[in-house]
A protein has these predicted regions:
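Non-heme iron-sulfur electron-transfer modules
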Residues: 1-10, 39-64, 72-94, 137-156
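Short, solvent-exposed interaction modules
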Residues: 86-118
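Cysteine-centered iron-sulfur cluster-binding motifs in ferredoxin-type domains/subunits
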Residues: 21-37, 53-69, 120-129
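Short, intrinsically disordered, charge-biased short linear motifs at domain edges
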Residues: 12-24, 50-55, 105-111, 115-121
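Boundary-flanking segments of nucleic-acid-binding domains in nuclear regulatory proteins
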Residues: 115-117, 129, 143-147
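Extracellular/lumenal glycan-associated surfaces
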Residues: 69-70, 101-102, 127-135
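Ordered, small/hydrophobic-rich secondary-structure cores
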Residues: 2-40
């Protein structure tokens, strides 16, 4: 599967062995990254992602936990993330459909190949086809509400 172009992945946080990309418009604050490697993903620090503070493989493993696809990685020594097979769709009481697999998405910016995404289930998103929390449902498993999401690291 071809990896998305770097300019479609979000802001880059480079370290010698791995680059982490963060797309704040897709983050729904599930906090898998913060729980997985708090020394790397620290929303109280600037920059909030420091990929150099852990082993590159450990960073990649935690990034793959991100259910929304807001985080991506590129290892210096390997190809891009491989998709899950078969494709898995999970419903989430907090709003989005969580999808993992070899995804071909039609977006407002054109076609996109993806491995993980939180897709809008309510139809109110301004970031089609991705969930942006427009439904006002709890923003993430960590207990963040929509109001908390607005003051999260993505906006700072």
């Amino acid at each position: 599967m071809a990896a998305p172009a770097d300019d479609r992945l979000g802001r880059a946080y480079a370290a010698p062995e791995v680059t982490v990309f963060y797309d704040r418009g897709r983050c729904r604050h599930y906090a898998e990254c913060v729980r997985g490697l708090p020394q790397v993903f620290d929303p109280t620090r600037r920059p909030w992602i420091r990929a150099d503070l852990a082993d590159a493989q450990a960073v990649a493993e935690v990034v793959r936990r991100c259910p929304t696809g807001a985080l991506h990685y590129r290892l210096l020594t390997e190809e891009a993330e491989e998709p899950t097979s078969p494709t898995i769709i999970t419903t989430d009481s907090r709003g989005p459909l969580l999808v993992r697999g070899d995804l071909a998405l039609d977006t407002t910016e054109g076609p996109l190949r993806e491995t993980r995404a939180a897709l809008c289930a309510c139809g109110r998103t301004q970031n089609q086809p991705f969930c942006d929390g427009a439904c006002g449902v709890n923003a993430g498993a960590a207990g963040g509400t929509r109001d908390q999401a607005e003051t999260s690291p993505q906006k700072r």
